[in-house]
Amino acid sequence: MIRTDAKDGALVLFSGGQDSATCVAWALERYQTVETLGFDYGQRHRVELECREGVREALKHRFPAWSDRLGDDHMIDLSVLGAISDTAMTRTIEIETTANGLPNTFVPGRNLMFMTIAAAIAYRRGLRVLVGGMCETDFSGYPDCRDDTMKALQVALNLGMDTRMVLETPLMWLDKAQTWQLAEQLGGEALVELIRVETHTCYVGERAELHDWGFGCGECPACKLRKRGYEAYLKGERVTEAPL
């Protein structure tokens, strides 16, 4: 397909979770065109993908100013990533810390593949900005979520595609309480409530019970951090250490 001229638009990595939903709202406040991109890689918590359309529709209907800006959604089958991964995100195994100090929820190469595919789609669609919810403040230590990684990837992608794309990571230095706060700043209590009810974070895919902070098992690291972040947000506090 012929490449279109670069426009005031962004492509957001959107999993259906809290962080990426916040990033979609962040982009909608800044760019005239916002498209979304999801990946089905055989994740254990595949229910998050089922939340994506509900979040998109809610954003359109509850925030009229954003409705015309929210463009196409793209879903990519990346089952090969799940096939080559042996992690707690792609296998039904206990979540634990590995010998290298990383949790076994780390999927090697995941964000590198996500951003590379996103860049190829953005190139074709004429979108200049890629947006991801990576951050260094969630205590996971994932190397492909680090600021240095994203900066290096931006350089590599632009060299390899002869473009001037920008990789934006608006949550990079925000803790989970500040992520809730950002949602409030972007869309008020209505956006906070949308994210609380419509998004999914739980690693094990539990979506049977709605807690104060959202759906989830309440026991996995993702649920504990989301819960702690929501509680800290309500109290005006920060999340300075990993919840137990």
Curated annotation (Swiss-Prot):
Pathway: Purine metabolism; 7-cyano-7-deazaguanine biosynthesis. Zn(2+) binds at C202, C217, C220, C223. It comes from the Bacteria. The keyword Oxidoreductase does not apply. Gene3D superfamilies: HUPs. It catalyses: 7-carboxy-7-deazaguanine + NH4(+) + ATP = 7-cyano-7-deazaguanine + ADP + phosphate + H2O + H(+). ATP binds at F14, S15, G16, G17, Q18, D19, S20, A21, T22, C23, V24. InterPro entries: QueC, Rossmann-like_a/b/a_fold. Its cofactor is Zn(2+). GO terms for molecular function: ATP binding; ligase activity, forming carbon-nitrogen bonds; zinc ion binding. PANTHER family: 7-CYANO-7-DEAZAGUANINE SYNTHASE. Catalyzes the ATP-dependent conversion of 7-carboxy-7-deazaguanine (CDG) to 7-cyano-7-deazaguanine (preQ(0)). This is 7-cyano-7-deazaguanine synthase. It comes from Burkholderia cenocepacia (strain HI2424). The lineage of its organism: Bacteria, Pseudomonadati, Pseudomonadota, Betaproteobacteria, Burkholderiales.
